[in-house]
Amino acid sequence: MQTTDLGNKEYGKIWHRKPSPSTNEGIIVNIVHVDASHLSKSTRFLQAAFDSAGDCFLAGDHLGNVYMFNLNRNRFDLVQKTMQACTAIAFNLHRKTEFLVALADNSVKCFDAGAKELVSWMRGHESAVTSISIHASGRYAVTTSSDTAQLWDLDTFQRKRKLNVRQSVGIQKVFFLPLSNTILSCFKDDSIFAWESDTLACKYQLPIPEDETKLHYKAFAITRDGRMLAAGGKSKNLHLWCLDSKQLFRIIQMPAKVRSVQQLEFLPDNFDGGSSQILGVLSQDGIMRFINIQTCKLVFDIGNPDNRVVTSSVSPNGRYITSVMENGSLNIYSVQALSKELNKPPPPLVKMVDLSKDKDSTGNKSGVSRASQEKVRVSSGRTCRPWKTKDPIVRTKYLRPEDTTASEDKENALPAGLNKPRLQAMLKGFGEYPAKYRMFIWRSLLQLPENHAAFSSLLDKGTHSQYKLLHQEYPIKSRKLLRVLQRTLSALAHWSAIFGETKYLPLLAFPFVKLFQNNQLICFEVVATVITNWCQHWFEYFPNPPINILGMVENLLAHHDKELLQHFINHGVNSQVYAWPILETLFSEVLTREEWLRLFDNVFSNHPSFLLMAVVSYIISSRSPLLHCNQKDDFEYFFHHRNNLDISNMIREAYHLMDTSPAEIHPQRLLSDFEPLTRGQYPIFNKYPKFIVDYQGQERERIRQEEMEYLRERQLTQEVEAEAVKRRLEDQAWYQQQELLKGAEEQRRKLLMDEEQKLLHQRQRLATVKRELRLKELQLLDAARRRFLRYQQDQRKMELRRLDDEIERKVSLREQETATIVKDVEIRQMELEAQRRFFEQQLAKEQEAVTQDMKGELDANRRRADLEEQMFWRLMETEEDLKDQKLLEESLAKAERLCVETDWKIQSLQKQKCDDWERGKRYEEISKLTEDVQEKERELCNVLKDMETRKWAEVSQKMTELEREKLAGSAQQAQRQQFLQEKLRQEAGPIDISGEDGNEYFERLRDLNRSSMQKDFSSSDEQHVPENVCLNDVSASDSSTHFSLDRGRGELERGERALISEVRELRQKLASQAHKKYPHLHFSQTSWS
């Protein structure tokens, strides 16, 4: 094993001697990167990725260095220094020198490996990018992180769409399916969705496995044809999904050493049609095992417990595997060396002949070489476990010989002693027949009958009408070659009418005509044999191309190279573009002479289906330049011109296609075996739509007749035209003489006309000058008039502007004055209203204070009356006749109280109604003159002062009356107390009042009297507070608890109403004066509350 240290070199050789990988390890070279300044430190490689061809790969280390390794040229180059560790690399973009690198700062950068420069910088991820998937066209990329996946356009490097998921779900991987526009997204909950990359609409979802079969997917791999998905995770089982049926069709169980799967990779094979059978499984032990998913056998493995594999990348051509090892180095493996043991031929089978008549015993006694072989049972949907077998047994199946030996010998026997199998063996050995004997071998293989008489009869019919003008359509330099081609095509057209209508027949027959131009019979029969055998079913859809044959070619291409067919479909290229041009010329346009001869050595030596296989082989062998074609014109040019091609590889590929194509699509199933031409007379060729050919023949005959008629008419026309020319010449001479006479006359007349024209011209000039002078004069007058009109218009505009300014100034002044007056009036009104509200508030406060005093006094009197009543009724408990009276008095007092309260409520409602009615009749706000308003306000103040004096006089009078009433009440209270004390002394025994209770009662009564006296003194001191509420004293003779409330507000309300009426009258007077003085002022109605 070779080891290469990159050191500080930026370029160099990968290996220094020719690598010879062993079959055990298969390592071509081990690449390490040791820092020269610190020998103990080595740079660790992190990621690696191959290009689309599979011969170059990129590798990035943890310092941000990206190296490109070219395994064909044995060279490495340092293409970029990113200064950051890379987390993912992709190297299969549509521009072959560009690559994508995902860095540790969550960004993705695009670099050019050739120019070693930055192309674009893509941001958008919030966490590290774990994978990059490129579309088959190389123009789109999907980058995946743990929380999001983003779709990028690699032409503009703009983000097209973004896939977000809940944090609880998370994304495992998002990638493109090969050969399709489908994006597969795999999430951490084992759900897998397929999306259309153009519209990003969900196409389908794979069913989530049941709990007992869940693997918690972490690794995924897809086959090249995009039909099978392998998934693995935290288990030793692998799930294989069929994406066509969207079902889990197989579960593979790995060995017991495998506990979890870290990475999955399919190993491509050039001959599996994209359905890869070898799957690489990287497990937790660092060993990557490659297994056959059909037989569940271990093919080979890489890595070991001492130096584990971290990640691996498989080349698209299946030749190399690049692995990043645990120690940071890079191993390059040769798949051919690793699978050499697998590709060895089986050991020779030694059998013993048993003379026993029993066939079964003979089979059982035969000795078999002992070869270690593990048989594994694989069933759909179940884990695959190996059978426990003892000695492996190889059973031999004896086939009964069929009675076909004679027929096969007859078929293989050729004239002149040649044998077809021997010719085929020689052809496989040398690749071609000897040039000296090629024509002889071809004649033998084609078994030409050499029917001289039949061919002469065809030649005697002459040149076919369809090919009389062949030299115009195909200008061939050699007259002999043109003549032979014309005769051969005419003979074919006379043999079968279809060949007179076939446009491509000259292209098909020309290479054989050029090859057999010295023997026209052989040339005709070779072309006829090719048409009858290798052009089977070509004319069934005439005049259209053979759709059935082209369908066979397309089916073969779809099976063996689906990617190339999809490329054709994507660019609108069908089989009539990539297959029919080759068939209709029999490869003569795309191959050189020597290549064409080698190809037809093999075509004539095999079944007629080999020609179709050769077409498919040519297309597949040219897949690389075809995949680079993007325009339909490029494809058409490619299939009509010669291209660089290894004919040997193409022929080998054709034989491979013959052997590996399934029977259902193999052309051999639909094409008949080789049948030579019959001797004596040529066979009838009528495998074409006869009515179409007959119709075209009739149409051609009709056209020929019309052409003959046209020629006769043209002959007559020419004769008439000759006579007409003769007469025309005579007429022309006479006309010339007449023209000379007319010329002389015209010359004289022209002189007269010139003079007249000169005179007329002078008059016209004079009239023109006069008209111009008149026009100038009119223009000057019009300009003067317009200037004067503009002057007048400007003067009027200025006058109008002055008037408008004056009007605007006066209106503005009037509006300002009006607004000032209105504001003054509003302010005065607001002041009056505020003053009125202030007075009302003062009155309400005073009224509230009086009401509170009266409430306190009433409460004291009520409590005192209750005590007295309680004491009195205690004294009168023995008199039962007073109980009824007490009840009646209580009821009467309650009725009187309710009556008084009802009257009070009625009065308040009436007052409120009156106030509302008066408020609704208030007049509009008007402007008042300042002096009148002040005078009226002084009058109003005087009236208010008079009313205030009168009111205070009334208040003093009522206070005097209140004092008298209080004194009278105090005297009556003293009498009642004295009376009660005397009664208590007289009847101390029956009442049985304890001393303590009596003392308590008198103390309470004394407290109530004292509080009432204090209130009386305080009310008498405050002489400025009006007393609007009065209490009627309870009569001494009345022993009931009833007392009457007289609010005493009637006189105050009447005074207030009189004051308000005077204010209204005053406002009416002011409003009438204002209307008389300013009749044009109008104010909006304003209601004040």
UniProtKB/Swiss-Prot annotation:
SUPFAM superfamilies: WD40 repeat-like (SSF50978), Ypt/Rab-GAP domain of gyp1p (SSF47923)
Domain Rab-GAP TBC, residue spans: 432-607
Domain of life, source organism: Eukaryota
GO biological process terms held by the UniProt record: cilium assembly
Family matches, as SMART domains: WD40
Cellular location(s): Cytoplasm, Cytoskeleton, Microtubule organizing center, Centrosome; Cytoplasm, Cytoskeleton, Microtubule organizing center, Centrosome, Centriolar satellite; Cytoplasm, Cytoskeleton, Cilium basal body
This protein's UniProt keywords: Cell projection, Cilium biogenesis/degradation, Coiled coil, Cytoplasm, Cytoskeleton, Repeat, WD repeat
Cellular component terms per the entry's GO annotation: centriolar satellite; centrosome; ciliary basal body; cytoplasm
GO MF terms, alphabetically ordered: molecular adaptor activity
Keyword rRNA-binding belongs to the record: no
Region (Disordered): 355-383
WD repeats: 33-74, 75-116, 117-157, 158-200, 201-248, 249-296, 297-334
Coiled-coil features, chain-numbered ranges: 698-852, 892-951, 1050-1077
Keyword Cytoplasm: yes
PANTHER family: TBC1 DOMAIN FAMILY MEMBER 31 (PTHR19853:SF1), WD REPEAT CONTAINING PROTEIN 3 WDR3 (PTHR19853)
Function text: Molecular adapter which is involved in cilium biogenesis. Part of a functional complex including OFD1 a centriolar protein involved in cilium assembly. Could regulate the cAMP-dependent phosphorylation of OFD1, and its subsequent ubiquitination by PJA2 which ultimately leads to its proteasomal degradation.
Protein name as it appears in the record: TBC1 domain family member 31
Organism of derivation: Xenopus laevis (African clawed frog)
